[in-house]
Amino acid sequence: MFTLKKSLLLIFFLGTINLSLCEEERNADEEERRDDPEERDVEVEKRFLSLALAALPKFLCLVFKKC
């Protein structure tokens, strides 16, 4: 019974360490994503440019009234 308790304690201890390491890695990944504003700016620019290019023909049609 004592060896079973030791084994369970060891498994619990190793599992706890593993979970804490995973949590630290996940937190580091989240911080890295939050710390990179350039990537967000590029994504916003891409979305803005695609919307602007999609609306350009409609705008030109309204301005020149030649559809």
UniProtKB/Swiss-Prot annotation:
Q: Does the keyword Secreted apply?
A: yes
What is the species of this protein? Rana huanrensis (Huanren frog)
Q: Where is the signal peptide?
A: 1-22
Instruction: Name the InterPro entries on file.
Output: Frog_antimicrobial_propeptide
One GO biological process term is: defense response to Gram-negative bacterium
Tissue occurrence: Expressed by the skin glands.
- According to its record, what are the GO cellular component terms? extracellular region
The record lists its disulfide bonds as 61-67
Pro-peptide region(s): 23-45
> Is-annotated flag, keyword Secreted?
yes
Localisation per UniProt entry: Secreted
Q: Which domain of life is it from?
A: Eukaryota
**What does the similarity note say?**
Belongs to the frog skin active peptide (FSAP) family. Brevinin subfamily.
* Name under which the protein is recorded: Brevinin-1CDYc
> What the protein does?
Antimicrobial peptide.
UniProt entry keywords in alphabetical sequence: Amphibian defense peptide, Antibiotic, Antimicrobial, Cleavage on pair of basic residues, Disulfide bond, Secreted, Signal
